Swiss-Prot record:
SUPFAM superfamilies: Ribosomal protein L29 (L29p). One of its GO terms (molecular function) is structural constituent of ribosome. The gene is rpmC. This is Large ribosomal subunit protein uL29. Transmembrane segments: none annotated. PROSITE patterns: RIBOSOMAL_L29. The keyword Ribonucleoprotein applies. InterPro entries: Ribosomal_protein_uL29, Ribosomal_uL29, Ribosomal_uL29_CS, Ribosomal_uL29_sf.
Amino acid sequence: MKAQDLREKSVEELNAELMNLLREQFNLRMQAATGQLQQTHTLKAVRRDIARVKTVLTEKAGA
């Protein structure tokens, strides 16, 4: 997910994307805790995607 793509979305779409990412992060954390997660790099990728969405939301709030 690129920040450029996120900047083209509306605030409502960004909030929906953020909620989906937070749900996905929760599920991945639970899988990691129970030892079921094979691709541990996805945790880092989702965390950074969440940060990107939050950054764009903050930019839009200030503009």
